C-alpha cells in the first residue's frame, strides 16, 4: 500500500460549550504515510484516544480537516478500517465462536477466517465473552480486527492487559501483517520499550498538539545526548539538561555539527527522547519531512468551529 493513510490540517476537537469547552485536540497538522507502524504516545489526557476516534469515523472534528485513506469522511471508508478501543466493546452474551461468526457476517468479501482463527487460537470456542479475562478479550478483539483484513488498523492501548508472552506473540503478528499486506497500524501505548522495537513511525501528542512526528530513526538522529563540562550549548536547541557536580548532561536537537572536543556525544534511545520531551513541554515541536504538511493546504473545505457534543 502506497500513499498517505492519514493527513490532518489544523485538526481540532472541543467537547462541551464553545466558550468553556474542553479542547482535546488543537491545531494538529501531520501526515502518516501508508504502510507504517506508528506509535502514538503521550500522557493521559493528551488527546490520543480522541485522535483515534476521529480517524475511525466515530467522532467529528470541531475544526480543520482529517483525510483517512483518501476520504475526508472517515466513516465512508469504515469497511477498510479496524479499530480496537481501550474498552474492547464485545457482546458479553455471545460465545467466542459466535463472535467470530459475526465478524465474518459483517465483513463479507474481506473476512480472513484462517487469520482470525489463528489469533483467537487458544480461546475455548464455546466460552462466553463475559467469562473471558481481560487479556483473552484483547486477543478476541484483535482476531476480529485482523480477520477483517483492514488497510488501516487503529489500536488504543491494545497490549495493556496481556501477559508478556502473549504481548510478544501478538506484536509479532502485527509486524508480520504490515510486512505481508502493507497494513498501516497506529498504536497508542505507554509501554515505550516495546514501541522502540516494533514501530518505525512516531507521533507524540501532548496538550492536544503534535509535538513530534515522523520516521522514528529520523527523529532520534536529529537529537544527541551531550555530556561534558562545557556550558555553551548553542546553536543547538536544548530539550532537557541536568547538572551533576561539574558535569552537564543535555538532550539537544542538533543545529549543525557538535563540538566533539567539548562534548561526549551519544545517540539517545527512543525512550530517553520521548521521556525528555514529555518532561519538557516547552521544547519546540519537530515534524520530519515525511510527517509535515504544507501550511495552509487544507484537504477539502476547512471546517469552522461547530457545536460540540
Where are these regions (language model features)?
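ABC transporter nucleotide-binding domain
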Residues: 168-252
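Short, surface-exposed beta-strand/loop "edge" segments at domain boundaries and coil↔beta transitions
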Residues: 153-154, 232-235, 255-260
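ABC transporter nucleotide-binding domains
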Residues: 3-193, 197-200, 204-206
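C-terminal coupling/interaction segments
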Residues: 2, 239-309
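A generic structural signal for secondary-structure junctions
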Residues: 108, 224, 231, 278-279
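Non-catalytic surface loops within mature trypsin-like serine protease
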Residues: 17, 34, 230, 254-256, ...
Amino acid at each position: 500500500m502506497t500513499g498517505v493513510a492519514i493527513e490532518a490540517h489544523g485538526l481540532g476537537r472541543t467537547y462541551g460549550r464553545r466558550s468553556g469547552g474542553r479542547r482535546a485536540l488543537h491545531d494538529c497538522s501531520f501526515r502518516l504515510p501508508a504502510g507504517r507502524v506508528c506509535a502514538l504516545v503521550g500522557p493521559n489526557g493528551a488527546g490520543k484516544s480522541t485522535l483515534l476516534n476521529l480517524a475511525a469515523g466515530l467522532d467529528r472534528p470541531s475544526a480543520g480537516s482529517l483525510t483517512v485513506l483518501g476520504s475526508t469522511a472517515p466513516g465512508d471508508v469504515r469497511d477498510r478500517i479496524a479499530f480496537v478501543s481501550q474498552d474492547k466493546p464485545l457482546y458479553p452474551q455471545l460465545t467466542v465462536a459466535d463472535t467470530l461468526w459475526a465478524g465474518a457476517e459483517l465483513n463479507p468479501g474481506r473476512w480472513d477466517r484462517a487469520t482470525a482463527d489463528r489469533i483467537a487460537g487458544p480461546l475455548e470456542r464455546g466460552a462466553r465473552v463475559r467469562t473471558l479475562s481481560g487479556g483473552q478479550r484483547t486477543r478476541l478483539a484483535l482476531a476480529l480486527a485482523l480477520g477483517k483484513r483492514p488497510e488501516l488498523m487503529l489500536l488504543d492501548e491494545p497490549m495493556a492487559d496481556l501477559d508478556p508472552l502473549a504481548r510478544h506473540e501478538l506484536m509479532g503478528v502485527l509486524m508480520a501483517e504490515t510486512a505481508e499486506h502493507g497494513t498501516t497500524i497506529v498504536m497508542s501505548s505507554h509501554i515505550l520499550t516495546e514501541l522502540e522495537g516494533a514501530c518505525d513511525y512516531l507521533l507524540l501528542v501532548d496538550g492536544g498538539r503534535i509535538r513530534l512526528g515522523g520516521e522514528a530513526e529520523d527523529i532520534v538522529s536529529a537529537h544527541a545526548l551531550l555530556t561534558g563540562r562545557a556550558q555553551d550549548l548553542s546553536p543547538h536547541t536544548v530539550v532537557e539538561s541536568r547538572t551533576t557536580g561539574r558535569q552537564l548532561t543535555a538532550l539537544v536537537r542538533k543545529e549543525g555539527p557538535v563540538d566533539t572536543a567539548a562534548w561526549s556525544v551519544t545517540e539517545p534511545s527512543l525512550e530517553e527522547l520521548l521521556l525528555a520531551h514529555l518532561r519538557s513541554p516547552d521544547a519546540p515541536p519537530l515534524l520530519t519531512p515525511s510527517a509535515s504538511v504544507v501550511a495552509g493546504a487544507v484537504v477539502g473545505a476547512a471546517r469552522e468551529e461547530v457545536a460540540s457534543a
